[in-house]
Amino acid sequence: KDFEIWHGGSHTFMKNSGGDLRIRGDVIKLAREDSSARYIECNVNNAVQIFHNGTERFTTTSTGVTVTGDAKVGTGNSTGVILTSPDGTEYRLVVANDGTLSTSSV
């Protein structure tokens, strides 16, 4: 079966094994097939939450995002990470190969 829909009491479930699965709703929850772990929860006009191994790690807020745990940022070929201070000033943060850290106004 490529696509299944079933209802279990208070909730409706969908299982897709081929192609895109496009879902619309005011609250969308994605979880393991056996519901043992959550992946993503989306709530209209509210937070989007992303989970890792059952623990909330990334959440959108009205002012930005909240990251729980470590955040690893790779810069690729760019020249650092740009951070904005509370007063709106932007700073470029660069970590050199030898581990030295430098900042400069953008």
Cite the ranges covered by each PLM segment:
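Self-maturation zones of extracellular/virion spikes and adhesins
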Residues: 1-56, 64-106
